[in-house]
From Swiss-Prot:
Taxonomy of the source species: Viruses, Adnaviria, Zilligvirae, Taleaviricota, Tokiviricetes
Localization terms from the record: Host membrane
Keywords from the named record: Host membrane, Membrane, Transmembrane, Transmembrane helix
Its membrane topology: Single-pass membrane protein
Keyword Transmembrane helix carried by entry: yes
Native species: Sulfolobus islandicus rod-shaped virus 1 (SIRV-1)
Transmembrane segments: 10-30
UniProt effect for mutating residue 22 to G: In strain: Isolate variant XX
A GO term from the CC aspect: membrane
Protein name as it appears in the record: Uncharacterized protein 98
UniProt keyword Transmembrane helix present: yes
Amino acid sequence: MAITLLEGALYGFFAVTGVLIASFIIGEIVHLYNEKQSNENFAKAIDQMSKSTVTAIESIKDTTVTGINALLNMDTLRDVNSLAREKAKDQNPSSQAK
């Protein structure tokens, strides 16, 4: 059986169509894999940013608490100094007369 020219052209057409379909499928698989990798990397980046934000907020909170404690300590120190001056005045009335 000899293959006629028309049959040869038809087989060639099917072969080229099969190659094109196979390349399209492989291209889609590669595209979907790259998209999956991109989404995973994006999710990792968002997770890292969330962790950094939490760390920054905790740092701001700690700094604020430290500042408030420092202000309270200054106020307490002022009270202690006032009490010490009053006590010194009470114990040493002759120094006021000078």
